[in-house]
Amino acid sequence: VTVLRELYNQLPQESVIYFADTARLPYGTRSPQEILQFVQEILGWMAQQGVKMVIMACNTSSALALEAVQGHYPFPVLGLILPGAKAAVRHGQRVGVIATSATVTSNAYQRAMVEAKPQIQVWQVACPQFVPLIEGNQIHSPEMRQVAQTYLQPLMDQDIDTLIYGCTHYPHLAPVLRTLLSPTVQFINPAVHVVAAAVRELDALGLRRSGVAQPTQFYTSGPAPQFATVASQWLGYQPQVQMLPLSVLQSPGAGVESGIAAAIAPTPNPTVPPLDNALSPLLT
């Protein structure tokens, strides 16, 4: 929910539809073909809601599906990789990336950074144990610290000056990671930068809304109470969550993605209570 929190910070006037594809987690171990299929299903459903923008708030789906789906929907689709990479090259020369296995294998961050700054040096580490520990509320446990030490050691050995959170779960680990890395290391949270890109895009398109936002609408493909409990710890309030069965996403005419995606809706749709210019995050 780190992207959602940034939406609240930078675009408080926008209403949000938030979709979490919890039934098909984790995305980080899925094949590129599976991830693309999930993304298309989710985006199709978002299109039915009349959204005006989608932020694909999952690094794995941003890395493996964004280019394939951009330009195929009646709204802009933004991803995390490019905004995060651009921020990193502005801050450092020796960049570490911690991410899921799928994101690391895609080399999406490395390609984006080298394209922006050919002399940049990049090291990537897959961190598959982080998400289960975070979702198990084990952020401050001895096990988390030991796992983090193991994952970060190769990056510390390279004397990195910048670290990218290559998964939207990872900013929750800041208290742990900052105790392990040099205080001079810059931390890059792509969520901050993708929402800043969304602000610029909305302004350029004349779609930015003014006024008071309506309450965020939360949907999940898995059990709603479980997601509500976890999300409440990170949001500071208890969200009202509705379950959206996979059968709805997979029906003809529907399409979606996994991970957090933010969509902004200009027109009402009978499937969802009408929203005036709503932002909708899709979460993996």
Describe every region a protein language model picked out.
Residues 1-284:
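Non-catalytic structural scaffold of enzyme domains
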